[in-house]
Swiss-Prot record:
Its main location: cytoplasm. This is Phosphoribosylformylglycinamidine synthase subunit PurL. Substrate binds at S99, H100, N101, H102, R121, Q245, E317, S318, Q319, S540. It comes from Shouchella clausii (strain KSM-K16) (Alkalihalobacillus clausii). Belongs to the FGAMS family. The lineage of its organism: Bacteria, Bacillati, Bacillota, Bacilli, Bacillales.
Length: 741
């Protein structure tokens, strides 16, 4: 074995150095048992990253099995770089969401930027051209210097990378709550398009075929990044800044174009991104999936730092790198393409038939372990689960019913809450028009991207109200799926499938594991009912510090198909005189609501209820009406209730609304589920009402640029001009950022 100046196998075991790498005593013993001998330093490192939660899902795998992953249009489910769904005409959509939470907490610009880079590579490693980026962000209250710094730097990192690489950032969401103060969540999603014939797999097939390393050189950045992402943040986390990767979007652009060129060649057998766990995960996973092995000579790996050890080379998470398997004898074809793009393309190994990962360095074997042991044999845990005391208390509480005496003031204050307020400050930093396919820009219910050369378009969104999930994880899980689907339907799209990013605290705490368990129950039930299979995703646990865990935050990335661009619908009012309809009933449901947080400062009670059969029926009826051309505008009712949703429909158009509702002032802000606000031409009234059975006409669009909401007695409960609404909504975030902490 290696003569390098590293701890011996005896020292690793005696001093339990494996613990510093993230392995438990039992896990280290199991790894040694599988290999059949003591592990050296490099081998211990390989197991530590591959058996981390980030790579192995050892604490969540038992729950992920609940998700429906099959469907008539699913071409690739979980297990590859990204999932794929057929959209007919020999085309498919490829999409995936991933987290970069821990890196963004200590180095927000690079943490966010490399999160974008990694998710792009996941998509183009499948052979797809990325056409859109989205993100879902969570921060503490926008008051302290620290939170403002994290917010500004994360947004700048996303913009800096996405804008340079030439992929539009078209949508997302931002939520602000105290639980994210020290634990920001940064989830990045990418959507790509592909022809069926170009679909690639990350597999190392064909004994004797060549393993090639392409892209940027390997440095010491990101070593143990996967392990770092699998532990709680602490006061010592800043010392792990080297575990944060550094991105180069211009290198990524070259790599993207070169990879999309080589996928056209049948000399390419397999391709995978070197993401979490770098060269270890890409080589072990590609070999394991193909039932093969890989032998690599680490002397051949391009290095940008002197004296790198095998341990460092294998665990580095340097960005903009891919691992390819190429047909033996045709390496020159692949090299020629990468050289034309001024990129490394180096032969570093060969595919073997012994199902082992064998690494050599300076003429010595420095690691020799079974690939399946690394990629498949991590222990799987079903952690103890315990109902949190707060949940039992919430279930016993009388419903929270606020008293609203001044509805105008309440609406303006709600519009200025950072979670509801306009995110224009965020998305104006993104180039959302690059590639010139963006039809519906950020700010509506979902972004829409046209598919060139066809009459079709893709709608996409990210959604999760984590407050509902804290109050009731199972109900909140159902709502997260339903709201994402509602946003797509409001845009004229049929929901196709889901990619999820499950962000939670420490699963070793029974109350946290219970949250994970119950929310996955809700998510899976809703996916089955609404016909949206989960085709991939990511789990990010240990999102907590001494102050406590984040709310359960399973971010839902959902993509839908607009079958005809004529069906594209947006939220803004279109014509004066159009009838305003509310679909769905309003109940006095305020548990976990924006109003409760604003008035009380904390959450309690029961989450809004949802009937998935009713949800499905309303979505189908509304989509049918949209396809018939009966709907002028559509918007789902979410945070802040009907009053906020009506105001949002006025923000970007020269119209107002006159509405009458038989609701109390408080109920105007209730967050009951399965509701929509749509507008319809008077001439289409009968056909619309025959199609959408739950729709009730409540008023009309006016030219007055005022929002007037009357009660059943005809008295104006809300009466505000557009300028007041826009000022509160658009000015909130810039104003908070300028204020002194």
């Amino acid at each position: 074995m290696s003569q390098l100046l590293e701890p011996s196998a005896e020292t690793i075991k005696a001093e339990r150095l494996y613990r510093e790498m993230g392995l438990t005593d039992d896990e280290f013993a199991l790894a040694e048992k599988i290999v059949g001998r003591p592990l050296n330093f490099t081998e211990t490192g390989l197991f530590s990253v591959m058996w981390s939660e980030h790579c192995s899902y050892k604490n969540s795998k038992v729950l992920l099995k609940k998700f429906p992953t099959d469907g008539e249009n699913v071409l690739q489910g979980p297990g590859e770089g990204a999932g794929i769904i057929d959209i007919k005409d020999e085309q498919a959509v490829v999409f995936k969401i991933e987290s970069h939470n821990h890196p963004s907490a200590i180095e927000p610009y690079q943490g966010a930027a490399t999160g974008v880079g990694g998710i792009l590579r996941d998509v183009f490693s499948m052979g797809a051209r990325p056409v859109a980026l989205l993100n879902s962000l969570r921060f503490g209250e926008l008051e302290s210097k620290k939170v403002k710094y994290l917010f500004e730097e994360v947004v700048a990192g996303i913009a800096g990378y996405g804008n340079c690489v030439g992929v539009p950032t078209v949508g997302g969401e931002v939520q602000f709550d105290p639980c994210y103060e020290s634990n920001p969540l940064v989830n990045a999603m990418c959507v790509g398009l592909i022809d069926h014939k170009d679909i690639q797999k990350g597999q190392a097939k064909g004994v004797g075929n060549t393993v090639m390393y392409v892209g940027a050189s390997t440095g010491r950045d990101g070593i143990h990044g996967a392990t770092f992402a699998s532990e709680e943040l602490s006061e010592d986390s800043d010392a792990k800044r080297p575990a944060v990767q550094v991105g180069d979007p211009f290198m990524e652009k070259l790599l993207l174009e070169a990879c999309l060129e080589v996928v056209q060649s049948d000399a390419l057998i397999g391709i995978q991104d070197m993401g979490a766990a770098g060269l270890v995960s890409s080589s072990a996973e590609m070999a394991s999936k193909a039932g093969s092995g890989i032998e690599m000579n680490l002397d051949l790996v391009p290095q940008r730092e002197a004296g790198m050890t095998p341990y460092e080379m294998m665990l580095s998470e340097s960005q903009e790198r891919m691992l390819l398997v190429v047909e033996k004898g045709r390496e020159h074809e692949i090299k020629a393409t990468f050289e034309r793009w001024n990129l490394h393309a180096v032969e570093v190994g060969v595919v073997t038939d012994d199902r082992r990962l064998r690494l050599t360095h300076k003429g010595e074997i420095v690691a020799d372990v079974p690939v399946d042991a690394l990629a498949e044999d991590a222990p799987v845990y079903h952690k103890p689960s315990k109902v949190p005391a707060y949940f039992d208390a919430f279930q016993q509480q009388a419903p929270y019913i606020p008293e609203i005496t001044e509805a105008n003031e309440t609406l303006l204050k709600l519009l200025a809450q950072p979670t509801i307020a306009s995110k224009e400050w965020v998305y104006e930093q993104y180039d959302y028009m690059v590639q010139t396919n963006t039809v519906v820009e950020p700010g509506s219910d979902a972004a829409v991207i046209r598919i060139r050369g066809t009459n079709k378009a893709l709608a996409m969104t990210t959604d999760c109200n984590s407050r509902y999930l804290y109050v009731d994880p199972e109900m909140g899980g159902k709502i997260a799926i339903a709201e994402a689907a509602r946003n797509l339907v409001c845009s004229g799209a049929k929901p196709l499938g889901v990619t999820d990013c499950l962000n939670y605290g420490n699963p070793e705490k029974p109350e946290i594991f219970w949250q994970l368990e119950k929310s996955t129950d809700g998510l899976s039930e809703a996916c089955r009912e609404l016909g949206t299979p989960v085709i991939g995703g990511n789990v990010s646990l240990y999102n907590e510090r001494s102050g406590g865990a984040v709310y359960p935050t399973p971010v839902i990335g959902m993509v839908g198909l607009v079958e005809d661009v004529a069906h594209i619908t947006t939220q803004s009012f279109k014509n004066a005189g159009d009838l305003i309809y509310v679909i769905g009933e309003t109940k006095a449901e305020f548990g976990g609501s924006e109003l409760q947080k604003m008035l009380v400062g904390e959450l309690s009670g029961k989450a809004p209820e949802i009937d998935l059969a009713v949800e499905k029926s309303r979505q189908q009826q509304l989509l049918s009406a949209i396809k018939q051309g009966l709907v002028q505008s559509a918007h789902d009712v979410a945070e802040g209730g009907l009053a906020v949703s009506l105001a949002e429909k006025m923000m970007e158009c020269p119209f107002g609304a006159e509405v009458s509702l038989s609701l109390s002032a408080a109920e105007l802000f209730a967050e009951s589920q399965s509701r929509f606000i749509v507008t319809v031409k008077p001439s289409d009234q009968q056909r619309f009402e025959n199609t959408v059975l739950d729709a009730v006409v409540v008023g009309a669009v006016t030219e007055s640029r005022k929002l007037t909401i009357r009660n059943e007695n005809g008295n104006a409960v809300i009466d505000l001009c557009q300028d007041e609404l826009v000022k509160a909504w658009k000015g909130a975030i810039p104003c908070l950022l300028k204020s002194k902490a």
